């Protein structure tokens, strides 16, 4: 799969831009702050319905504009599709596929798949658990787009349950009066049902990614491993099937109910879990060097690419200013590993930041213009 044409209107710094794209490597080169990342960010948005840089859509709309539009032509084998997303901050976004407006934004998931390498990837190893949960859930959705609905259901139920718990906590603090918590039982069931499906997918994903990540780390840093991925659930237990995970979550919610009412927040569930990344016998966070942490983060992304490619729809590889963060050895090894990709999009401040093995199409980016060299 590859993108053959990218069109942006009022997206980030671009009033309007048209970028023809070929299979193989394409590099966008120009000084920082000129809009290189905006181009690959738009491609990533088509794949995830979100940005790797900001948490809301508002910053994606050019200042003074009401909406932004991302449009892309995508080819998979002999099949071509036209995807369009209209970003409307404060209102519902809109989507079109092959000019049909009878689709929801979520329906475009799976048409474009990307694996993004970016400076922010270091947070996968050194950052908070939320970074690792996001890594798992975005990859789950790339494998199975319907999981976007499950994630949305879980977030909605979690919000409703937290509202009820917060009200109960406030009522208890003010005068000692109690609330009818019978509806909490219903929310527990909804939360456990969606949570169990999400957990089952996460556990299956980790089992698939583990050997691929270990192989990728060995390719990047020979003799430096092994690496191991270990899921750390907030609801204790060894369950793996969806049914057993449901029972495990229900038991954990019952056990935590008194404390949750006191604190006014849900304390167990996938939103509180973590992924432990081990290097050798030690956790990478806190023990791995800066270089080892980079190798680990890159290995996770390479494993994601290998997994999606093996499942039949090769993703677009996006390397956003990542080579400038790496030493010469890691830079060359990463370039050699991604070069065979069907489509590789690279951004760099200067030509020298793009390894020679990634020779291909070049665009210069400056002052809102994108020109092919």
UniProtKB/Swiss-Prot annotation:
Protein's UniProt keywords contain Protein biosynthesis: no
Q: Name one GO molecular function term.
A: ATP binding
- What does the record list as coiled-coil region(s)? none
Q: What is its main location?
A: cytoplasm
Q: Where in the cell is it found?
A: Cytoplasm
* UniProt keyword annotations, A-Z: ATP-binding, Cytoplasm, DNA damage, DNA repair, DNA replication, DNA-binding, Nucleotide-binding, SOS response
Q: Which Pfam families match?
A: SMC_N
Q: Where does ATP bind?
A: 30-37
Q: Which family does it belong to?
A: Belongs to the RecF family.
Q: Which PANTHER family match?
A: DNA REPLICATION AND REPAIR PROTEIN RECF
Q: What does this protein do?
A: The RecF protein is involved in DNA metabolism; it is required for DNA replication and normal SOS inducibility. RecF binds preferentially to single-stranded, linear DNA. It also seems to bind ATP.
What is the protein name stated in its UniProt record? DNA replication and repair protein RecF
Its taxonomic placement starts with: Bacteria, Bacillati, Actinomycetota, Actinomycetes, Kitasatosporales
């Amino acid at each position: 799969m590859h993108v053959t044409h990218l069109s942006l209107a009022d997206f980030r710094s671009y009033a309007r831009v048209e970028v023809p794209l070929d299979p193989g490597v394409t590099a966008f080169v120009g000084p920082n702050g000129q809009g290189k990342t905006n181009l690959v960010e738009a491609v990533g948005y088509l794949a995830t319905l979100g940005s790797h840089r900001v948490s809301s859509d508002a910053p994606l709309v050019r200042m003074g504009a009401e909406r932004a539009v991302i449009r892309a032509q995508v080819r998979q084998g002999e099949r071509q599709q036209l995807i369009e997303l209209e970003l409307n901050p404060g209102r519902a976004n809109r989507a079109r596929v092959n000019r049909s407006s009878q689709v929801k934004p979520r329906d475009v998931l799976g048409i474009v798949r990307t694996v993004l390498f970016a400076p922010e990837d270091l947070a996968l190893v050194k950052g908070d658990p939320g970074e690792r949960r996001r890594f798992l859930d975005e990859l789950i959705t790339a494998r199975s787009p319907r999981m976007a609905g499950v994630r949305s259901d879980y977030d909605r139920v979690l919000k409703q349950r937290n509202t009820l718990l917060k009200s109960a906590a406030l009522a208890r603090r003010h005068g000692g009066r109690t609330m009818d918590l019978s509806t909490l039982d219903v929310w527990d069931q909804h939360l456990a049902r969606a949570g169990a499906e999400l957990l089952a997918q996460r556990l299956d994903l980790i089992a698939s990614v583990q050997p691929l990540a270990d192989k990728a780390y060995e390719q990047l840093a020979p003799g430096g491993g092994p690496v191991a991925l270990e899921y750390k659930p907030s609801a204790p237990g060894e369950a793996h099937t969806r049914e057993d995970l449901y029972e495990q979550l229900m038991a954990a919610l019952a056990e935590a109910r008194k404390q949750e009412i006191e604190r006014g927040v849900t304390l167990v569930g996938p939103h509180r879990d973590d992924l432990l990344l081990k290097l050798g016998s030690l956790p990478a966070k806190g023990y791995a060097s800066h270089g080892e942490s980079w190798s680990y983060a890159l290995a996770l992304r390479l494993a994601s690419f290998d997994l999606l490619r093996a499942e039949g729809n090769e993703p677009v590889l996006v390397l956003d200013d990542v080579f400038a963060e790496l030493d010469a050895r890691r830079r060359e090894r990463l370039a050699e590993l991604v070069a065979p990709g069907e489509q590789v999009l690279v951004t760099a401040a200067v030509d020298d930041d793009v390894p020679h093995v990634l020779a291909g199409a070049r665009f210069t980016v400056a002052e809102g213009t994108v020109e092919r060299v």
